[in-house]
């Protein structure tokens, strides 16, 4: 299932929701606050995050190397969180939560933007595949719930006891912060973006907040304390209807990210997945 899901534009739309759930854990939020370049290089940081997630699924032998690279990168990340508690990026509870967020976000994104919700059998298959991704990241099976039925009590426990609206969460859903224009593309485009950025940034931040909060599972949204109105929900349902009609009919080159598209082509699996 991940072969069809992970590199598709719908997964990219849902990625900020998972990232925000991750940094709602005080230890993860503190690590990002203290060590990440997401403020000074947001576009580069996002690009590297997307590339890494693509390797987990489509990287073949490179997936294991990416898992080792990530663990080496995170090994020195440690400090004290906002409550004065010591944190370490590779602490079992912290690293496991970062990985665990993917499954409920995929599930909710499918409910919003997919043709239909996953069946119980599909959920079990997706979860089994997500466990395999965890192994790539160096997470032992014994440290993760082994079935969806075991996952949900763990998940609800983290929501109830751990998550909060951290400084980083507030920044990721804010509509009044400054984000620099993307430094990519030809010179004329960068110049045009710099000129138009004051007008473009406010609506882009509103869209970012809408997708981040809307594609987050409602129980996580409530646990973190993110506002979401009935009007927001109606707009999300309208957005989901548009996406579920448009995305399946897109050509492969527009529907999938380049890494996923190339891997699917090499595997002879470039056919459409009508989810």
Which residues does each predicted region cover?
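Mature, function-bearing regions of proteins
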Residues: 1-275
